[in-house]
């Protein structure tokens, strides 16, 4: 099994990169986000690889980080999500944004990915709620998860985060602001109050 490729970029296509490793070229299918972070032909390239072996084909999927690869596999554990849809989700959301969307039960954020309809979005946020990669950093917004806790009604929180992102803030900024707002407002606060308090946090 191939776990990582280190070589030079030979060609970048619409959904793949051709990596030259000592004269042998490998095709690795990637998310649009990963492809956008790669350099140009002739530049060095390092990709974490997930190898798919089927009876009639062998495919390599490439990722900038091991975390992105972990999310790729986790997404496919949900019914209706294959490699194509998993890459579409990772093209639309960063690992951190995806973790926040799941913690917030924010189906709308997940539904922005091509190929993800309402039913699949519901399954993603529901089934993966307690299965996100269990380490901090970009993938997990610790403050937000602490404020939500288990069993907290997430709809007002998701609405507040969505409203703040519509105002131009990043999803991580919005999530942090709403998490701070929940400390002040408490679990029973409606979305309007969370938005007001969140804006105050962002204005500081």
Curated annotation (Swiss-Prot):
Chain spans, region Domain I: 1-64
The protein's role, per its UniProt record: The RuvA-RuvB-RuvC complex processes Holliday junction (HJ) DNA during genetic recombination and DNA repair, while the RuvA-RuvB complex plays an important role in the rescue of blocked DNA replication forks via replication fork reversal (RFR). RuvA specifically binds to HJ cruciform DNA, conferring on it an open structure. The RuvB hexamer acts as an ATP-dependent pump, pulling dsDNA into and through the RuvAB complex. HJ branch migration allows RuvC to scan DNA until it finds its consensus sequence, where it cleaves and resolves the cruciform DNA.
Highest taxon of source: Bacteria
Name of this protein: Holliday junction branch migration complex subunit RuvA
Region of interest called Flexible linker, as start-end residue ranges on this chain: 144-151
Subcellular location, record wording: Cytoplasm
Keywords, in A-Z order: Cytoplasm, DNA damage, DNA recombination, DNA repair, DNA-binding
Stretches for region Domain II: 65-143
Domain III: region residues: 152-204
Gene Ontology cellular-component annotations: cytoplasm; Holliday junction helicase complex; Holliday junction resolvase complex
Biological-process GO terms, alphabetical: DNA recombination; DNA repair
Family membership noted in the UniProt record: Belongs to the RuvA family.
Main localization of the protein described in the UniProt heading: cytoplasm
InterPro entries, A to Z: DNA_helicase_Holl-junc_RuvA_I, NA-bd_OB-fold, RuvA, RuvA_2-like, RuvA_C, RuvA_C_sf
Native source species: Rhizobium etli (strain ATCC 51251 / DSM 11541 / JCM 21823 / NBRC 15573 / CFN 42)
A Pfam family of this chain: HHH_5
Quaternary data: Homotetramer. Forms an RuvA(8)-RuvB(12)-Holliday junction (HJ) complex. HJ DNA is sandwiched between 2 RuvA tetramers; dsDNA enters through RuvA and exits via RuvB. An RuvB hexamer assembles on each DNA strand where it exits the tetramer. Each RuvB hexamer is contacted by two RuvA subunits (via domain III) on 2 adjacent RuvB subunits; this complex drives branch migration. In the full resolvosome a probable DNA-RuvA(4)-RuvB(12)-RuvC(2) complex forms which resolves the HJ.
Written domain comment of the UniProt record: Has three domains with a flexible linker between the domains II and III and assumes an 'L' shape. Domain III is highly mobile and contacts RuvB.
GO MF term list: ATP binding; four-way junction DNA binding; four-way junction helicase activity
């Amino acid at each position: 099994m191939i776990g990582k490729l280190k070589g030079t970029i030979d060609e970048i296509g619409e959904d793949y990169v051709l990596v030259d490793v000592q004269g042998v070229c490998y095709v690795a299918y990637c998310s649009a986000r990963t492809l956008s972070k790669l350099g140009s032909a002739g530049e060095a390239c390092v990709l974490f690889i997930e190898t798919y072996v089927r009876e009639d084909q062998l495919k390599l999927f490439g990722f900038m980080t091991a975390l992105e690869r972990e999310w790729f596999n986790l997404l496919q554990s949900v019914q209706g999500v294959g490699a194509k849809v998993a890459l579409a989700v990772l093209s639309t959301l960063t690992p951190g944004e995806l973790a926040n969307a799941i913690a917030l039960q924010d189906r709308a954020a997940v539904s922005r990915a091509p190929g993800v309809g309402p039913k699949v979005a519901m399954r993603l946020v529901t089934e993966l709620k307690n299965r996100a990669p269990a380490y901090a950093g970009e993938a997990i917004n610790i403050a937000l998860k602490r404020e939500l806790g288990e069993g907290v009604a997430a709809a007002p929180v998701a609405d507040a985060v969505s409203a703040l992102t519509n105002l131009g803030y990043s999803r991580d900024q919005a999530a942090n602001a709403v998490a701070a707002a929940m400390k002040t407002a408490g679990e029973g606060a409606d979305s309007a109050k969370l938005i007001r308090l969140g804006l105050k946090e962002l204005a500081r």
